Amino acid sequence: MSARHSDAPQRVVAAAAEMLATYGLNASSVREVAKRAQAPFGSTYHHFPGGKQQVLAEATTLAGTKVDALLDTCLQGAAPDGLSLFLAAWRERLIRSAFHVGCPVLAAAVEEPIDDAPDDARRAAAEVFARWEARLTEALSRGGRSPEQANGMATMIIASIEGAVAMSRATRDIGPFDRVAAQLVSLVADR
């Protein structure tokens, strides 16, 4: 088996995460994902017997894992500084994509499958959001907040960032994101 074929499953999952971020859940077909991944269509179903839902659930998990790593890196220091770094990375992603790329985890969370398929991608999104909340809660707790306050702030931060990304994509303008980012950093720094 060539190296190109042996890494086909990873390329398929990565391509699916990109499609989720750009086009959403229902527009991400297995055929188009395989094409973008330059993977054989037939072998895609061999590697992913659960079909589209399995591919998209794994893509959602992969996207979440990448953000886990970014959060871990950003949140090594003080929470306000770490949040600023994380927001700067998201800001760059929005601008670099000309506002065409959003969060694949949010896409998996908010779209219902158009068929009666299981909602594996939504469940994967819920697990990812829970991990992000836990990371942020821990960082905010290290900064002296009570567990309850830290958890509430973590939920608000995630929801605010996701909403700001959606608003900036809709308006093709970084303004909504920048305003939300400034408020979040100010709120987290306010002790």
Question: Which residues fall in each region the model found?
Answer:
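N-terminal intrinsically disordered/low-complexity leader segments
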Residues: M1-D7
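Helix-turn-helix
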Residues: R11, M19-E58
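Short, basic, alpha-helical segments at the C-terminal edge of helix-turn-helix-like DNA-binding modules
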Residues: T60-K66
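Hydrophobic alpha-helical connector segments
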Residues: L71-V101, M153-I157
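Helix-loop "lid/cap" segments that line or gate small-molecule binding pockets
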Residues: C74, E92-I95, P104-D116, L140
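Amphipathic C-terminal alpha-helical segment
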Residues: R96, E111-I114, E138, I158-G175, ...
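Hydrophobic alpha-helical segments that form the core
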Residues: P104-A107, P147-M167, R179, Q183-S186
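Hydrophobic alpha-helical bundle segments that form small-molecule/ligand-binding pockets
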Residues: D115-P118, F129-A154, D190-R191
